[in-house]
A protein has these predicted regions:
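Active-site-adjacent helix/loop patches that line small-molecule binding or acyl-intermediate pockets
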Residues: 150, 154
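His/Glu-rich zincin catalytic helix
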Residues: 1-82, 189-295, 414-426
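Short, low-order "capping/linker" segments at domain edges
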Residues: 145-149, 243-255, 360-371, 377
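Histidine-acidic residue clusters that define the catalytic metal-binding segment
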Residues: 2-18, 162-201, 235-237, 363, ...
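Short, polar/flexible loop-turn hinges at active-site or ligand-entry regions and domain interfaces
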Residues: 124-131
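M16 family metallopeptidases and their MPP-like homologs
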Residues: 30, 35-53, 65, 81-123, ...
Length: 426
């Protein structure tokens, strides 16, 4: 019998149950008997930026794209194709790789327990052969070409390459033709046994199922036969400066696009609080309710595509601003002026209160569906905090904290601008 701890959220009147199984797997379950079906996320703490690591006293390196390759191959095992089995249960399944995690997910209204068993079976039982790995290489190469045709992907990749000289976050998630050619069954097994260990994974489930039943299904279906030791990621020795400050490219887009990046210091302390502080700063700098945003919008310098965002992971952190604009250099100049003015004038406590209230409301709305909750549970667990901790952090963040962060961040010497022109302008 597994002892589950109940984690409650007074702000939402909601709760979830958490436990670590005997094998080390973290299980989080938000029981919602009034909701139909379930949504499950099985997440591993390995992403495209998981590259250099120690295992068994040896330094090892995974080629770019290995985490994504593993994601593809784990859903094609000895039992066949996982998606075909999910189709038999009526489940809608998917898998994806980001810079710091790999997730296997499904949503189902019928045969939910069978679907959960399928998920656990496939991820805990890798099957890599020379033939199936070589076959997958062609499939991933086609996906890579489609992936690189996305303007959003192009903008992000180019900015990260401009900001980071060494850190593997500068490399594409899917890898390159050269790195894919270096991936072998033996290398995939090494990566799997180093990082697909129960202690480095979390299963989050939300919907009409009990935590006890989830634990029972884990014991029945999740039995990875691991070899060797866990991998320990080695930090990249990233220099402070940026690689370059301005670059221009082109592709088939209807209007010029841009992305501004500020290279920040990697988060060393409370990750949740730091990310929230930067989110609030971005809202106060150029949120849709600010005079600055509306001046840019009314003058035609930006449109509704404009965004700001923090982008953080192990050993990297940057803030990004971008969208469509015919004059991206002008937008950057005005943004620098806005930052300088805000540093001089200080953070307005009343505006901060409004921003916190808005973030609070967004958090409440984001925890509605089974998919929203399971995804948030898994992500927060891998980052080292609980989803409901967000409310306490928002309640205690101060204007002084934001002001100090503002004075130490958004450094013009650690900033870059990438411009993506329509092909006909190049």
């Amino acid at each position: 019998m597994t002892d589950f701890t109940t984690v409650r959220c007074p702000e939402l009147g909601d709760s979830y149950r958490a436990a670590r199984l005997e094998n080390g797997l973290t299980v989080l379950c938000c029981e919602r008997p009034d909701r139909r079906g379930i949504y499950a996320v099985l997440a591993a703490g390995i992403g495209s930026a998981t590259r250099d690591y120690l295992c068994g006293g040896r330094r090892r390196t995974l080629p770019a794209g290995t985490a994504h390759y593993l994601e593809h191959k784990l859903f094609a095992g000895k039992r066949g194709d996982a998606f075909e089995l999910f189709a038999e249960t009526g489940a809608n399944a998917n898998a994806y790789t980001s810079y710091d995690r790999t997730c296997y997910v499904f949503g189902a209204n019928e045969q939910t327990e069978r679907s959960l068993g399928i998920l656990l079976d496939f991820v805990s039982d890798p099957y890599f052969t020379r033939a199936n790995v070589d076959k997958e290489r062609g499939i991933i190469t086609e996906e890579m070409n489609m992936y690189l045709d996305s303007p959003d992907v192009r903008l992000l990749n180019e900015v990260l390459r401009m900001l980071y000289r060494v850190h593997p976050v500068r490399d594409e998630i899917v890898g390159t033709s050269a790195s894919l050619a270096a991936i072998t069954p033996e290398l995939l097994y090494e990566g799997y046994h180093a990082f697909y260990r129960p202690a480095n994974m979390v299963l989050a489930v939300a919907g009409r199922i009990t935590a006890e039943r989830v634990a029972e299904l884990c014991r029945k279906h999740y039995r990875p036969a691991l070899r060797g030791e866990a991998g320990r990621v080695l930090p990249a020795e990233e220099p402070d400066g940026v690689v370059c400050t301005r670059a221009v490219g082109s592709m088939a887009v209807s209007r010029r696009q841009f992305c501004i990046g500020f290279k920040e210091r990697p988060i060393a302390g409370d990750r949740l609080r730091t990310e929230l502080i930067f989110d609030l700063l971005c809202e106060l700098i150029c949120g849709e309710s600010t005079d600055f945003y509306n001046e840019l919008y009314d003058s035609g310098l930006i449109n509704g595509s404009f965004f700001s965002d923090g982008f953080a992971g192990s050993g990297y952190f940057c803030t990004l601003f971008g969208g469509e604009s015919d004059e991206p250099d002008r937008v950057l100049a005005l943004l620098q002026e806005r930052l300088a003015a805000l540093r001089r004038e200080g953070i307005d406590p009343d505006r901060l209160t409004e921003a916190i209230r808005s973030a609070w409301g967004d958090m409440v709305v984001s925890l509605d569906s089974n998919a929203d909750i399971a995804t948030a549970l898994a992500y927060s667990s891998l980052k080292g905090y609980r989803i409901y901790d967000t409310f306490e952090a928002l309640r205690t963040i101060t204007a002084d904290e934001l002001q100090q962060t503002l004075l130490q961040s958004f450094d013009a010497d650690r900033c870059c601008l990438y411009i993506l022109n329509p092909i006909e302008r190049s």
